[in-house]
């Protein structure tokens, strides 16, 4: 298995594999790792990869073009692309066991306020959260999932029997976000976001948040609108 990490902080992630079980598994070539810096694909002379949100809202979003270019560069037929975000289904041990059979997993790690939603729509094979809490970036989440996945690769654990014995804010998830360009890979930003009517944008975001929560987190109870 090969695991590729798309990130703004490759050096931050490398150190996790310098010790313990994962280091030994790498040395035995039971899996391999690769780190890709978004900035290497930036079209900005200052290597910036963040943009303001369309329609307003706090914080910046990762610009879609560098991430798309990075994915186009490294993706192969057998690649399985996973986006890390708190607004997704919960990663479980069942997922870890299933993904341990993949030949190539690509973790796309968020920063700032996350991704332009169109990236997920175009490229994601799966979208995972590791819990109802917010981190400063997706790197820790992808490392958590990687650890859980790699442990299920035959030969990684000294005792295979170990595997057999192992056992937000508010009620809604965040609505989709978008940044420039207005049209990306044939997908346009929702028109209401471009009109600047913040009351309508707020109402639309609320409805989108309800739909997203029902879709990704059916375990969350959502009260019916009155």
Swiss-Prot record:
Residues annotated as binding S-adenosyl-L-methionine: 110, 130-135
InterPro entries: Alpha/beta_knot_MTases, tRNA_m1G_MeTrfase_C_sf, tRNA_m1G_MeTrfase_TrmD, tRNA_m1G_MTases_N, tRNA_MeTrfase_TRMD/TRM10
GO biological process: tRNA N1-guanine methylation
Main subcellular localisation: cytoplasm
Reactions performed catalytically: guanosine(37) in tRNA + S-adenosyl-L-methionine = N(1)-methylguanosine(37) in tRNA + S-adenosyl-L-homocysteine + H(+)
Subcellular location: Cytoplasm
Origin: domain of life: Bacteria
The keyword tRNA processing appears for this protein: yes
Keywords in alphabetical order: Cytoplasm, Methyltransferase, S-adenosyl-L-methionine, Transferase, tRNA processing
EC number: 2.1.1.228
GO cellular component: cytosol
GO molecular function: tRNA (guanine(37)-N1)-methyltransferase activity
Keyword flag tRNA processing: yes
Family: Belongs to the RNA methyltransferase TrmD family.
Function noted in UniProt: Specifically methylates guanosine-37 in various tRNAs.
NCBIfam families found in the cross-reference section: PRK00026.1, trmD
Subunit-structure text: Homodimer.
HAMAP family the UniProt entry points to: TrmD
Entry protein name: tRNA (guanine-N(1)-)-methyltransferase
Highest classification ranks of the organism: Bacteria, Pseudomonadati, Campylobacterota, Epsilonproteobacteria, Nautiliales
Name of the gene this protein is made from: trmD
